Amino acid sequence: MSVKIIVPSLGESVTEATIAKWYKKEGDPVKTDELLLEIETEKVTLEVNAPCDGTIGKISKTDGANVAVGEEIGEINEGAAANTAGTNNESAKAQAVTQPTSEKPVEKPAVVNNILAPSVQKLVTENKLDPNNIKGTGRDGRITKGDVLETINTPSAATSTPTVNKTNEERVQRVRMSRLRKTIAQRLKDSQNTAAILTTFNEIDMSKVIALRNQYKEEFEKKHLVKLGFMSFFVKATIEALKLIPSVNAEIDGDDLVYKNYYDIGVAVGTEQGLVVPVVRDADKMGFAEVEKAIGTLAKKAREGKLSMADLSGGTFSISNGGVYGSLLSTPIINPPQSGILGLHKTEERAVVIDGKIEIRPMMYIALSYDHRIIDGKEGVSFLVKIKELIENPEKLLLNL
């Protein structure tokens, strides 16, 4: 009896996907819930597992094919896995009897690319890691992104791949754009072509918020089991600024302006596959600890490729922190259909004038890119001034002033 392999439901409003990679070929034995393939949507990569024990009977859609939800992409001949495995074992025993023993130690076989997810293989290659020395914690011992990232943080755990002199043919690598990368490219270009994007800047003295964090970070972590970062301060300050300037939390829908009375804040996260913006829902109803936990959870899921469509959908305003990469100044691009995005940057000590005296202070440039069709210049400037006021006086955030 054959069992169909079909494209699963991909979330609300998502009807198409692309087959990223098959991990099995026709004739391979499989067990229930064993990984068969990965498919990519516009925002996430999803795994498709075997619905039963058996053998791959047919693969009707190969790597790179565009497929629809519910479409048949292959078949499993049910119940044949055990028999196939038994045959393979007998064959292996026969070979063991007839093959002469070599005096030279057999080298440990290299991990073949096709048992690594594309994103994992890319990360391994970019960091020149030997996958044989990475302990896999995924299903059936598969290496996950988290395993690779942990290895990168403890470099002694993996042996670097020796540098090889490349031929002229190997100096250029042509790689098909992933569905996520194509979506990012299209959305950013659409944003530039549709919105009247304008960027305004300000700078913040981070002295007080740094002092407050340093004073309470250990006590905060001990009580809430999460580290106190700066992003929670900026999320809370952003919400207060959005309440003051409602147009920044609005969007254009045809001939209508839609003002949103809720605050779902997107926080941009860079991954090896590209930039994603998971959403912290109803952030205005959260305390600092809840915001930090939500951001930490979403960032971890993003790095491991486990974000769901629900994690990425919606959002009324976004925050992007280029400072973690060392950026001093940038003009972030609006994430449509939102009307604004806040850009944070690297905190750097600079000479500033305080009460007529030159002092060294930790300063950060902030930027607001906004859609000038809906937000006036005065509103954009006032929005940043409010954030500056709250971050430079963090007690106002704590006292809800």
Curated annotation (Swiss-Prot):
Catalytic residue list: 372, 376
Top enzyme category: transferase
CDD domains, alphabetized: lipoyl_domain
Cofactor needs: (R)-lipoate
GO cellular component, one term: cytosol
Domain Peripheral subunit-binding (PSBD): 115-152
Alphabetized GO MF terms: dihydrolipoyllysine-residue succinyltransferase activity
Cofactor binding remark: Binds 1 lipoyl cofactor covalently.
EC code: 2.3.1.61
Domain Lipoyl-binding, chain residue ranges per copy: 2-77
Pathway per the UniProt entry: Amino-acid degradation; L-lysine degradation via saccharopine pathway; glutaryl-CoA from L-lysine: step 6/6
GO biological process entries: L-lysine catabolic process to acetyl-CoA via saccharopine; tricarboxylic acid cycle
Substrates-to-products reaction catalysed: N(6)-[(R)-dihydrolipoyl]-L-lysyl-[protein] + succinyl-CoA = N(6)-[(R)-S(8)-succinyldihydrolipoyl]-L-lysyl-[protein] + CoA
Superkingdom of origin: Bacteria
Classification via Pfam families: 2-oxoacid_dh, Biotin_lipoyl, E3_binding
Keyword line: Acyltransferase, Lipoyl, Transferase, Tricarboxylic acid cycle
Subunit field text: Forms a 24-polypeptide structural core with octahedral symmetry. Part of the 2-oxoglutarate dehydrogenase (OGDH) complex composed of E1 (2-oxoglutarate dehydrogenase), E2 (dihydrolipoamide succinyltransferase) and E3 (dihydrolipoamide dehydrogenase); the complex contains multiple copies of the three enzymatic components (E1, E2 and E3).
Record-linked PANTHER family: DIHYDROLIPOYLLYSINE-RESIDUE SUCCINYLTRANSFERASE COMPONENT OF 2-OXOGLUTARATE DEHYDROGENASE COMPLEX, MITOCHONDRIAL, DIHYDROLIPOYLLYSINE-RESIDUE SUCCINYLTRANSFERASE COMPONENT OF 2-OXOGLUTARATE DEHYDROGENASE COMPLEX, MITOCHONDRIAL-RELATED
Similarity-based family: Belongs to the 2-oxoacid dehydrogenase family.
Name listed for the protein in its UniProt record: Dihydrolipoyllysine-residue succinyltransferase component of 2-oxoglutarate dehydrogenase complex
The species this protein was found in: Rickettsia felis (strain ATCC VR-1525 / URRWXCal2)
